Amino acid sequence: MDEFHRNGKEDSSWQQCFLYPLFFQEDLYAIYHDHYLDGSSSSEPMEHVSSNDQFSFLTVKRLIGQIRQQNHSIFLFVNRDPNPLVDRNKSSYSESVLEGLTLVLEVPFSIRSKNSVEGINEWKSFRSIHSIFPFLEDKFPHSNYISDTRIPYSIHPEILVRTFRRWIRDAPSLHLLRSVLYEYRNSSENLQRSLIVAPRVNTRFFLFLWNHYVYECESILVPLLKRSSHSRSLSHGSFPERTHFNRKIKHILIFSRRNSLKRIWSLKDPNIHYVRYGERSIIAIKGTHLLVKKCRYHLLIFRQCYFHLWFEPYRVCSHQLSKNCSSSLGYFLRIRMKPLLVRTKMLDELFIADLITGEFDPIVPIIPIIGLLAREKFCDISGRPISKLSWTSLTDDDILDRFDRIWRNIFHYYSGSFGRDGLYRIKYILSLSCAKTLACKHKSTIRVVRKELGPELFKKSFSKEREFDSPPFSSKSGARSQRERIWHSDIPQINPLANSWQKIQDLKVENLFDQ
């Protein structure tokens, strides 16, 4: 495989016939077995995997022999379980074959994606989800509309095969992939839609298929959006004098209408910006309401006609940033209008201009998060802390570590918001719930627990907040300002509470369209 990685860019013969023989190499499944034991090949934690599942290379060799004799993959999934691919704990053999198939398909995909990234320097992947927020902070204030789209997980098997056929010319491999996809479709419960539905099937194989499909869409969509921009200069919308100049030039009538529009257009920033995380894609647009409707219509037609992907109406929402808040990534996203006074002195005269600029202002949904904490039994519906009874069987260190981890994740994730006063209300709920849990475990009161543990109780738990009050994060006065932002670069996914709240918001929107 390393040789294919080295020579893939120079020689395209690897697309012809190398994939299919690799499917039947026992060493490939030995690689998967090592990853399976280490827990690195699956996106699920190892505690969700049954310990009774035993991997048998003899069974894998027999399955490979059956494939060689019968020339199709049906025998991979019969005579095992009635629904072998849906239940991971009952089908380690089928899972191993799917993981081996994924390892093979990832070789040309990684080569192709690497070459694409080398050709487009601006399109880079980041580990942290917070890499999205600096982009939003830079582009959102200069946009007046936002289109939030939820990409569906349901994809027809034949569409996936066609996307692979564009860059793999190995026909046996495509036939094997088609057999696997259709066999999974036939074994699933929903036979009427004839679609692969993978939000709950969190395996490496289906995640790879969905990511590859989205990559195919974006590899065509993103260059089109960049090409639609008439200006290739650096962003200048944040300069007050440029913003004021753009407003005044619209009233100049000494040029003809056609030339004036061309000059004004050449001075504007690119008016369409695209960003995606997971299943959510956000497009920020600067223009009129008619332009937004046209852009939304053309994007839907592009995805439906070119990739045969149907979007339900509730999956596409458009908002005007100056009037409405958009819920995304666990935040309320809005643009806060901020007045700005600019004084310009020319010779002996002083000119004063009053400008209004937009500022990206993500809001923490405090009340919904408290409601989720109440659902998890940390407090009641009014926000009053209660003891976590299910944790009383743990040790004191485990209880403190769990509460500490919950608070640290919440505080780190929402550290980029301006108003962080509500976060300290969540800290109060978690800290008092921690004390009540320890008191309930030892059958005493909060005062006794605090007296026995002393200052170590809350020094050990919730201590990570001190990192933000020390250099280099602190200001000169020794405390962080409420207008300072810190986007952490070590957050790989959405906070669980924020993710739960986002799903509730999406469900509310879906119910509104159903009514």
From Swiss-Prot:
<dbReference type="GO" id="GO:0003723">
    <property type="term" value="F:RNA binding"/>
</dbReference>
<comment type="similarity">
    <text>Belongs to the intron maturase 2 family. MatK subfamily.</text>
</comment>
<protein>
    <recommendedName>
        <fullName>Maturase K</fullName>
    </recommendedName>
</protein>
<dbReference type="GO" id="GO:0009507">
    <property type="term" value="C:chloroplast"/>
</dbReference>
<dbReference type="InterPro" id="IPR024937">
    <property type="entry name" value="Domain_X"/>
</dbReference>
<dbReference type="GO" id="GO:0008380">
    <property type="term" value="P:RNA splicing"/>
</dbReference>
<keyword id="KW-0819">tRNA processing</keyword>
<keyword id="KW-0694">RNA-binding</keyword>
<dbReference type="InterPro" id="IPR024942">
    <property type="entry name" value="Maturase_MatK_N"/>
</dbReference>
<dbReference type="InterPro" id="IPR002866">
    <property type="entry name" value="Maturase_MatK"/>
</dbReference>
<dbReference type="GO" id="GO:0006397">
    <property type="term" value="P:mRNA processing"/>
</dbReference>
<keyword id="KW-0934">Plastid</keyword>
<keyword id="KW-0507">mRNA processing</keyword>
<dbReference type="Pfam" id="PF01348">
    <property type="entry name" value="Intron_maturas2"/>
</dbReference>
<comment type="function">
    <text>Usually encoded in the trnK tRNA gene intron. Probably assists in splicing its own and other chloroplast group II introns.</text>
</comment>
<dbReference type="GO" id="GO:0008033">
    <property type="term" value="P:tRNA processing"/>
</dbReference>
<keyword id="KW-0150">Chloroplast</keyword>
<dbReference type="Pfam" id="PF01824">
    <property type="entry name" value="MatK_N"/>
</dbReference>
